[in-house]
């Protein structure tokens, strides 16, 4: 009897702690997370190392969908699941996660682009529970496309630790997850989520959780109003938020570029705006260090030739055979802490269409850590394309990294694999996983230079502690196995 009670107690504790672990993915002071779908160069890290989710970004999508307790409001340009995901033994079944969320009572609303068989077929919607309300963007000469890549999780929750906004440049589509260069930005902030809900509700035409769209009130593109907040403070950093086309985003792109004191690094998929290209030349003539990665899709535009003439070898072009450089970011002063480093990113390509016709989102994060994370991705991509940067960020010393930042583990909760990322150099590092009874259940070695994958598929559902240690340092992190 005592044994049964003991096991029951531990089972209940596991369930309770699982909930707590799930709620604490974002630790105090760390409410902005960035991930990248292609390799990064952590040798230029100034503290925190960037995390690349190579062919695993779909798992991260699912992990955040599984966090939802009350609501999911999704604006996604393209959602496609196909057999290519089976190639790598990694089947991030986003549709199943959505349906499971709906089955457990999460109220879901979905806005997508009008189906375009070439660019946004949205075949993944065929697998979504038909009771989940979905609306498509309008068509017509005065409107472009619904190009956002946004998920708002528990945006209305009264608990300030619940609301999360998922954004960045990645569509929920096979190539975007497995092959293309994209960035993901995940922000846990109640006020920020409320601002994104205002935008969503304006397009939906109603505010009812999980309710049908009110087409009479629904507004897209140039028919929307500028009613969302534009400035937030998150983790002590200013974060700007803009929605196209009503917020004149190209103007804010120029303003952000012009705010640079020493350096601007650009990573843009589609660039047709010549005024932005000319500004690159103006800043370079003022002595600023300028560098750019541009996708081959932009070679059709005059702006590409302008940039090529201005930047010369400081611009590289991504000529992917079956992949894209799909980012739309700008890094301001990543190596100058006193200049106010910042990152601009989102769904907004640097085109007239994005500025005047499309539904897009853009954020500007004024934070040196975020700027350096993007710089690690930029640095790696620039060199992989044959370029050479003549100016580099100098890495900070190991003593400038806090213990809270030393080890990152994700996703939480996890099902089969746990990624362990070391932000400090640990010689002969090992890991040891313990269950709630203090029993050592898994052990292994860690590579300090890479993100490590730990197989936890054989563990029972519950809470565990992973202990990372070397000869003179030790760190512990708690995680939940679903």
Task: Locate each region found by the language model.
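Hydrophilic extracytoplasmic domains
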Residues: 361, 365-384
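Bacterial Sec-dependent N-terminal signal peptides
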Residues: 1-25, 480
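Short, compositionally biased serine/threonine- and acidic-rich segments at solvent-exposed termini, linkers
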Residues: 395-396
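Short acidic, glycine-rich surface-loop motifs adjacent to enzyme active sites
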Residues: 69, 74-80, 261, 266-268
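C-terminal outer-membrane/trafficking sorting elements
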Residues: 400-482
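A structural signal for isolated positions on well-ordered beta-strands in alpha/beta enzyme cores
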Residues: 73, 107-111, 265, 291-293, ...
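Long, repeat-rich segments with strong aromatic
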Residues: 254, 259-272, 276-277
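HKD-type phospholipase D/PLD-like phosphodiesterase module
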Residues: 24-67, 78-256, 293-368
